[in-house]
Amino acid sequence: MANILLVEDDSDVQTIVSEFLATLGHRVTSASSAEQARCFLASEPVDLALVDCLMEGEQGSSLAEHACKLGIPTILTSGDPHYIETCSEHPFPFLPKPFRLSRLDELIASTLHKSKTD
C-alpha cells in the first residue's frame, strides 16, 4: 500500500480520513498546515499527497504544485463552493467535500496507478 500525506486542517475530517486510509493498509502521515506538510515532504517517503485547498496560511494548490515538482502525485479537496471551482481548474485530481470514502479510495487508486504509468 502507499505512504499518504494527508494535509487537512479540520481535525474531525483528518481523523476520519486517516483512520479509513489506515484500514485499507495505507501508512498515513497527517499535517494540519502546508508548512507542516512541507517538513514531512522533505523528510518522509510520500507516495501521494491528499491536500485540502483552503487552509490557514499557504493554500493547498501551492502545496500541490510543490509536491508535483518533487514527483509526488497529489489530490486536492475542498468543501468551499468558491474553492471547488478554483481548485477544479488545477491539473490535479479534485475531490469536492463532502465525499464518500469509497470515492476517495477509487481516486487514490487511480491517481497512484496513473503516476506509475506516466
Residue ranges and their predicted role:
Residues 55:
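Receiver (REC) domain active-site loop signature in two-component systems and cognate sites
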Residues 33, 58-62:
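Acidic catalytic/metal-coordinating carboxylates
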Residues 75-78:
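Hydrophobic/aromatic residues positioned on beta-strands within the core alpha/beta folds
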Residues 30-48:
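Acidic, metal-coordinating helix/loop segments flanking the phosphotransfer/catalytic sites
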Residues 8:
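Conserved acidic carboxylate
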Residues 52:
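Active-site residues of response regulator receiver
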Residues 99-111, 116:
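C-terminal output helix
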Residues 11-29:
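Two-component/phosphorelay signaling modules centered on CheY-like receiver
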